[in-house]
Amino acid sequence: MSGTLLAFDFGTKSIGVAIGQRITGTARPLPAIKAQDGTPDWTLIERLLKEWQPDEIIVGLPLNMDGTEQPLTARARKFANRIHGRFGVTVTLHDERLSTVEARSGLFEQGGYRALNKGKVDSASAVIILESYFEQGY
């Protein structure tokens, strides 16, 4: 067990990616993966898994503020199930409420509107999802 985790912020056009270490509780963004109507380039995901060899994958679970599911929730679950089915790695779903808002705010502080490109926001969201997972003691 390396203690390495990959996190994905699922989206229909772009999937944010972050890598983190359980021992330090830290995460950093990786380049986002383009998706077509929620379907990623599976060869890119396979490459990420081979390169980083994570012990676990965290997929952000989009929920409404009251905790109820939204249309994207089922698609994120399906994405998580497909990762597990294709690659046999442990996949955990983690509440991602407000991660995009927090990511946008942090990126804006760093570089204004120019820093808010879609891929950067999605991968920054994946970092926040993974850090939140660590903070909850996982």
From Swiss-Prot:
GO term, biological process aspect, one: rRNA 5'-end processing
The entry's keywords: Cytoplasm, Hydrolase, Nuclease, Ribosome biogenesis
Keyword Signal: no
InterPro entries according to UniProt: RNaseH-like_sf, YqgF, YqgF/RNaseH-like_dom, YqgF/RNaseH-like_dom_sf
Entries under CDD domains matching the protein: YqgF
Highest taxon in the source lineage: Bacteria
This protein's GO CC annotations: cytosol
A molecular function (GO) term: nuclease activity
EC number: 3.1.-.-
Enzyme class: hydrolase
Compartments where found: Cytoplasm
Pfam families: RuvX
Its job: Could be a nuclease involved in processing of the 5'-end of pre-16S rRNA.
Family classification: Belongs to the YqgF nuclease family.
NCBIfam families in UniProt: RNAse_H_YqgF
Name assigned to this protein: Putative pre-16S rRNA nuclease
Organism annotation: Salmonella arizonae (strain ATCC BAA-731 / CDC346-86 / RSK2980)
Species classification: Bacteria, Pseudomonadati, Pseudomonadota, Gammaproteobacteria, Enterobacterales
The encoding gene: yqgF
